[in-house]
Regions:
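Short helix-perturbing small/polar motifs within transmembrane alpha-helices
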Residues: 115-155
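Glycine-rich ThDP/TPP pyrophosphate-binding loop and its adjacent helix/strand module
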Residues: 143-150, 158-226
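Individual transmembrane alpha-helix segments
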Residues: 1-4, 277-316
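Hydrophobic core segments of alpha-helical transmembrane domains in multi-pass membrane transport
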Residues: 16-29, 49-54, 120-125, 148-160, ...
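Aromatic-rich transmembrane-lumenal/periplasmic boundary elements in polytopic membrane proteins
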Residues: 233-281
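Interfacial loop-to-helix junctions that mark the boundaries of transmembrane helices
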Residues: 1-13, 36, 63-65, 105-110, ...
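Hydrophobic transmembrane alpha-helices
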Residues: 2-10, 20-75
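Alpha-helical membrane segments and adjacent membrane-interface helices in multi-pass membrane proteins
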Residues: 54, 58-118
Length: 330
């Protein structure tokens, strides 16, 4: 559901940068107040895990479409909404700059659509209320599926609203919505099941790692071992499983193709669009998750491993930076 720059007018892009930036600033303040040092490695490893998982497009049968995780609901269940939102920003920023996945002009939109709803609404509407009177396997599955379905529906609807506000006449609003929502309902269901599987593993391994958990049962694995398993899983998913990803267009591309006959629209190539495109051409060392001018599968594997590592470093580094400046001010 990564939007390209051609789908967004500069005014809409600026508005969404302000909205996403405001939430990010508020989240930084909240994260600075947190004192749990174990949250830092979880941010890094789970950021890497979500990055790798987003490389895996799964086929939606009988549609010609595919989908992939957003990851906001998974992260918010582990980190809480504020750290989860900042982690998602790290993932989306690396995808945009290093891999040209999603437009730079549209980054504010993508952060809002893919991170805000999952991290904040997923937490405050589903995760926290459902875990309030105790955590169980059934509640984890229910919250995961409901949270992913609803927040992905909101994200898909926001894409349509942003194209409407941008004056993209090639994508008539009512028809675009009618195409986007059903396919993302299916994608949301699959993401909910995957999210539930990961969270159930954590629940069995280290239940206290889950947000809102008051579990005091004996843990199956140590904290370090649990983090190591998730980290290794991220590397395996990014380096190997990504090779088996579906080549079908994702939900957004599929919807566009149904309406316009193409998975992409051309921007006007001037002004803000041209500037953003020029920047991405310089920063995207591994465009489309591969080496430039090469179809080598090694490029995909390298991108998955390298991207996961960069996201881990960025998330952990940013968190330590927040804490450093907090200590300096105090």
């Amino acid at each position: 559901m990564h939007m390209a720059d051609a789908l967004v007018a500069p005014a809409v892009a600026a508005t969404m940068y302000v909205c996403s930036g405001g939430v990010a600033g508020f989240s930084v303040k909240k994260v600075r107040l947190e004192s749990d040092p174990k949250k830092i490695p979880v941010m890094g490893v789970m950021g890497a895990f979500v990055f790798a998982a987003q490389m895996i497009n799964f086929t939606i049968p009988d549609t010609g479409s595919s989908g992939h995780l957003c990851g906001g609901m998974m992260l918010t269940a582990l980190l809480g909404p504020y750290a989860a939102f900042l982690t998602m920003i790290g993932v989306l920023l690396i995808q945009c700059l290093l891999f040209a996945d999603g437009g730079l002009l549209a980054l504010g939109c993508n952060i809002w659509n893919m991170a805000f709803y999952g991290c904040f609404l997923g937490y405050f509407l589903f995760w926290r209320p459902m875990m309030k009177k105790g955590m169980s396997r059934g509640k984890i599955v229910g919250a995961s599926i409901l949270g992913c379905v609803v927040t992905l529906q909101l994200g898909a609807f926001s894409v349509a609203l942003e194209t409407l506000a941008s004056g993209i006449t090639d994508l008539p609003f009512s028809v675009f919505v009618a195409t986007m929502q059903p396919i993302h309902l299916v994608i949301g269901l699959v993401e909910g099941l995957i999210t539930a599987a990961v969270l159930l593993f954590v629940y069995e391994a280290r239940p206290e790692m889950l947000s809102c958990s008051e579990e005091r049962a004996k843990s199956r694995f140590s904290f370090k071992k649990t983090i190591a398993i998730l980290g290794i899983a991220a590397l395996v998913i990014g380096g190997a499983v990504s090779l088996a990803a579906s080549s079908n267009p994702d939900g957004l591309e599929w919807s566009m193709e149904r309406l316009t006959g193409s998975t992409e629209l051309e921007n006007d190539g001037t002004g803000a669009h041209a500037a953003a495109e020029e920047i991405q051409e310089k920063t995207a060392l591994l465009p489309d998750y591969g080496f430039k001018n090469s179809d080598s599968t090694f490029g995909t594997s390298f991108s998955g491993i390298a991207g996961s590592a960069v996201v881990l470093i960025v998330c952990v580094g940013a968190c330590y930076a927040f804490r450093f400046f907090k200590k300096k001010k105090s």
